[in-house]
């Protein structure tokens, strides 16, 4: 028995399949095949009809659109609704006749509709209502023709508006139709002539909602879009108006560097401080150093940013930069070097410098770009950029804080600037702990300056914090000489901020440990930058450091030496983030070392923030390498900063 059934089943479709999914209750088993055949015969007709219907539908939709337009126009001109309805109705009919749209014949037979309601619905939602002619009311709606017409118009309108391929005209009307639909809805509810069977009504409402939703959704979207543009524009203007034009810089930075945030901040500072001033000056030598520095600073911006602003402001616009770069020292000292590191950056920045000329915005950006250019090492730059990006995100959180701080700070006059710078730096560096950082820093910064002179002592003094400062100071010393002041503070500040981290990180251990460190920085700086630039006392140390570092071919070697640096690229990316977080030693140390020499570890390790400073300083010297390295490491976090700093 079962086999027969099965055979039968294989031969014949299961009843539900036979009629398009609609079981045919009275059918005997014999009727199945027949039903199927009938269906097959009907199919071509169905297909054709659908095709024609689609075409007609397009035409109808066009008609409805025109009617809608007319209605809208009339509404605007204040005609009464009755008049509007009448006119629209006649207009619609006229158009229909003209377009050759069939009203009645084109609709498939009722039985087909019954059989395949789904299909019909999909093809022609507009056809749900029975056809109607102007004269006789709607076939199955007992409300007056005008009322029905309103429904139908609405329905079609509504359908067309949500249809997939709306004619272009539709957009214009969206608002009107939206309004209208609301009105219509109201009307419909008022005209409680059960104009539509409950089912139909439900459908209508659903559709209506859908339309409204999509309508308003798209409208909303559009609105947002424009709003954002507008707001963007507004922001831009505001920023332009801002004193330092920080924002522009900021903005630029963003784009320009990943760290936009920070950078920009820094940038701001840098630039902002003396945008115009900077422009020219910076542009020239500033560009060299400043920009380098700036760049550097920029990066740091977040961290050093504050400092910079001031420094920048400081008359040493360049200095500022330097400070920024802060790794002022580096900026100055390393002008050459920075150049290189910066060079890369600069390359990027190069354009900016001119921009800088532009002043506010540009300046900022210039520095940043410069910084970037300065970055000199492409890889470094790349790394830095990466870091920056990271930093940016990270800093975004701090940035505001930082930025605010920075902003204020910059305010300080140049004179104070420096110290500010220091403070800033520190704050920046401190980044994380901006509040405190800065102060100490500043203090340190001052000290740094003094120290700078002292260079060494500070170094020693750095002790914990001092190391950094020391380092920085130290570094600053060497560098400081040139930039000395700024750097000093910067350094100092950094350090200080760093110091915490620093210690461990601070190269102290790594480098030469603290003492060494102290020397180290100096040395590195000297070594790197100083050496070149300074030759200075640092030289011996530098040599030592160099030896230590292995080759101070700056970037490369250093990097090579430090395990961390060994695979800079990987490290940077992978390690970047963590380290900062984990500011501690490892990276620090490695960083340190890399940096340390220069700025020394302190920077690096220190905390990222510190790192910044530090290497910023150092980096400067070594900056690029260091930076990178540093950057890579802790820097990441700060690195970014740092990186930037250095990098830039």
From Swiss-Prot:
Basic and acidic residues composition-biased segments: 99-109, 525-544
Family according to the record: Belongs to the CWC21 family.
CDD domains: cwf21_SRRM3 (cd21376)
Entry function: May play a role in regulating breast cancer cell invasiveness. May be involved in RYBP-mediated breast cancer progression.
Compositional bias annotation for Basic residues: 168-186, 199-211, 219-243, 381-409, 545-560
Start and end residues of each CWF21 domain: 55-98
Disulfide bond sites: none
Compositionally biased intervals (Low complexity): 257-276, 289-317, 414-428, 461-471, 493-502, 579-648
Assigned GO CC terms: nucleus
Domain of life: Eukaryota
Chain residue ranges for the region called Disordered: 1-44, 99-139, 154-648
Name recorded for this polypeptide: Serine/arginine repetitive matrix protein 3
PANTHER family to which the protein is assigned, alphabetical: SERINE/ARGININE REPETITIVE MATRIX PROTEIN 3-RELATED, SERINE_ARGININE REPETITIVE MATRIX PROTEIN 3
Signal peptide: none
